[in-house]
Amino acid sequence: MGPTKYIIIAVVIIIICVILGLYIVDKKAKEKLSEASKEARRLKEEAERDAEAKKKEAILEAKEEAHKLRAEVERENRERRNEVQRLERRIIQKEEALDKKSEALENKEEALNKKQQKIEDVETHMEELHEKQRTELERISGLTTEQAKEFLLEQVRKEVKHETAVMIKEIETKAKEEADKRAREVITYAIQRCAADHVAETTVHVVNLPNDEMKGRIIGREGRNIRTLETLTGVDLIIDDTPEAVILSGFDPIRREVARIALEKLIVDGRIHPARIEEMVEKAKKEVEISIKEEGEQATFETGIHGLHIELIRLLGRLKYRTSYGQNVLKHSIEVSHLAGLMASELGIDPTLAKRVGLLHDIGKAVDHEVEGPHAIIGSEIAKKYRESALVVNAIGAHHGDMEPQSLEAILVQAADAISAARPGARRETLEAYIKRLEKLEEIANECEGVEKSYAIQAGREIRIMVKPEVLDDTGCIEMARNIVKQIESELEYPGQIKVNVIRETRAIEYAK
């Protein structure tokens, strides 16, 4: 056999093998397809079974849920029915209670109507009895109804008037005791903490001379030296028999101080003639001006007051040379400032404002001889001019009652001013003014009806009035004292305060036989 034959056999074998392989593959594929079909049918059957089971389960759950909902609805319906029944029972009970109350009210109304009728019957009977009694009383007393009313009203009026006077006296006494106690405490604390050291001053200065020959040199040839000094200073020089002394007299204390300084310098210098006098007077004026400024600054330093206008400080310094009833006005102002500040502290009020007003309250006295009007009003205008606050301006103007006080500080300064002025030894007045004041006091008292005698005692600080007991009763004495106080306050000027003491004495005398 040749190679071609082998090749053909090989090809045939290969073809046969391929055909067998294809057959085997096809067979296996058909087997797999059959198995897959079976598996698909199986899975489909299982899925159908599962779906049927779930459907049945869902239907069962839905039935159970419906059953639960039905049970819940039935329960709620039962509860609502029970609540409605309960409310119906309550309404029925309330209706029954209202019926009972209505019945009770009807019974009460009926009883009240009966009582009202009885009351009307009693009132009618009482009116009849009252009319009978009134007629009988008129017949017995001989007075008409109107006359009896007037008599009773007069009796009641007298009783009420007496009781009112007694009540007023008790209230006034109690209020005065309380007010006096508190005022004494405040004033005592203030006075204890304020120690003022100054004395009353006069309207004259005495200049000591080294010898009596100096008097002639002061007078000068034909009196030219003394005339020059008096003309330049406006002060009277009194040269009399008083050994080694010359008296300077004048009501302007600043001029008097200028004259004193100038005269003392002339005496020390020894050269006394008109030209030298004029030179010394000019020097003295400058010294006094410097002294005025220093005194004003010292006053503000002592009281702790700052921020004053320079002109107010100068006016304060001028007060050193001003007196009131012999009391130095600058020292008085400083004392009032301290007292007002201390009392303000005790009362819980701003002490700085009270001290400021106290220091400036008499500032008007520095120019009152140059400007017309009360010094309080002048002072308030000066304070306003130099831009002090409205409270300070008002307090200065109100410290003597010329203006209505608008602050507690104004009242405190009034009190401090009175305390400083009334302090024993602080002030004095001329004999003539003193006598006139005593006479006027007794005259005011004697003008009142029912006064038997009156005496001004305690240097005019008390008026003692003896009244006729048959003319005035105790109530009348109280009223008289109050009226006399008002009249004294309106008609008299006086330092401090005046006590009005009305005395009513009744004596009963019998003799045993």
From Swiss-Prot:
Keywords: Cell membrane, Endonuclease, Hydrolase, Membrane, Nuclease, RNA-binding, Transmembrane, Transmembrane helix
Compartment(s) where it occurs, according to its Swiss-Prot or TrEMBL record: Cell membrane
Domain spans labelled KH: 203-288
Main localisation: membrane
Recorded GO CC terms: plasma membrane
GO molecular function, one term: RNA endonuclease activity
Gene Ontology biological-process annotations: mRNA catabolic process
Domain of life: Bacteria
TM ranges: 6-26
Domain HD: 329-422
Function, in words: Endoribonuclease that initiates mRNA decay.
Entry similarity comment: Belongs to the RNase Y family.
UniProt protein name: Ribonuclease Y
Species annotation: Clostridium botulinum (strain Hall / ATCC 3502 / NCTC 13319 / Type A)
